[in-house]
Amino acid sequence: MTHTLRVIFAGTPEFAAAALAAIHEAGFPVPLVLTQPDRPAGRGMKLQASAVKRYAVEHGMPVAQPPSLRRAGKYPAEAADAIELLRTTPHDVMVVAAYGLLLPQEVLDIPRAGCINIHASLLPRWRGAAPIHRAIEAGDAETGVTLMQMDVGLDTGAMIDEARVAIAPDDTTATLHDRLAADGARLIVDALVRLERDGALPATPQPADGVTYAEKIGKHEAALDWRKPADVLARQVRAFDPFPGGVATLDGAAIKLWAAEPVAARGDAAPGTIVDAAPEGVIVACGSGALRVTQLQKPGGKRLPAREFLAGSPLAAGQRFALPDGA
């Protein structure tokens, strides 16, 4: 089906690329795509295009990559050029998903139907940069995707629609991300169909209660504090897959832990002590309970099941992982 509603799209990672693909495949014209500038990535630190740029280029969509959209920011000339491009590109609505740049009021006012954001949480819980990670880390039973009409606040706009998703006990940020991306793509296409048909989308202000913020994930958070309860550490490991991973330091080497589950404590070993190193998993004492680690990665190596890891990098009961710096 071909649609007439013209959609400018702004987004950067895979989560956003799923939405752009759905919009394009549904037949909505996309006269312009905004995405962040290419960034160095990988072992060679070569410049890499974003997932959104790769999709847009592959499908012949015009792409702009301004470093900022704020005239008062660090790149005023580039921002001015980008804003002029938005003004001169005929369109009806802008869809924004994990773009990574702030949109000032001047930009929000350009599209006739405003700017719609796809956010990976059930707002107002987990406003901010890392909603999927923080939902798993906190032990939430469910999360979801919210469509909102954007305003200048941080994820504070009125809500258009939402989809709820249960968080499974073995979900990681990677697995949950993929389900939420698919739901976000479905929601935005449905909303654009309604917008084209009705001319507007009803929206409900966010509740004042239940607001939490999902701070950006920092590498410094990766270090596991073994004094915490085992269930908390297991959630941290799942939340930090694929980035930055849960890090356990042994004799100065940072070992990444990628899969773990809480189990009953064995004895009264100090937190961080390896209680058992078996093919089924490495048991580590925690502040309460113990953690069975079933997937590990040594520096420069690959993720391996415990059995394969131990074959090449033996661990033994009595060894102790260090506590984080300053602990």
Curated annotation (Swiss-Prot):
InterPro entries: Fmt, Formyl_trans_C, Formyl_trans_C_sf, Formyl_transf_N, Formyl_transf_N_sf, Formyl_transferase-like_C_sf, GART_AS, Met-tRNA-FMT_C. One of its GO terms (cellular component) is cytosol. Keywords: Protein biosynthesis, Transferase. It holds the Pfam family Formyl_trans_C. It catalyses: L-methionyl-tRNA(fMet) + (6R)-10-formyltetrahydrofolate = N-formyl-L-methionyl-tRNA(fMet) + (6S)-5,6,7,8-tetrahydrofolate + H(+). SUPFAM superfamilies: FMT C-terminal domain-like, Formyltransferase. (6S)-5,6,7,8-tetrahydrofolate binds at S121, L122, L123, P124. Gene3D superfamilies: Formyl transferase, C-terminal domain, Formyl transferase, N-terminal domain. One of its GO terms (molecular function) is methionyl-tRNA formyltransferase activity. Its EC number is 2.1.2.9. Attaches a formyl group to the free amino group of methionyl-tRNA(fMet). The formyl group appears to play a dual role in the initiator identity of N-formylmethionyl-tRNA by promoting its recognition by IF2 and preventing the misappropriation of this tRNA by the elongation apparatus. Belongs to the Fmt family. NCBIfam families: fmt. This is Methionyl-tRNA formyltransferase. It comes from Burkholderia ambifaria (strain ATCC BAA-244 / DSM 16087 / CCUG 44356 / LMG 19182 / AMMD) (Burkholderia cepacia (strain AMMD)).
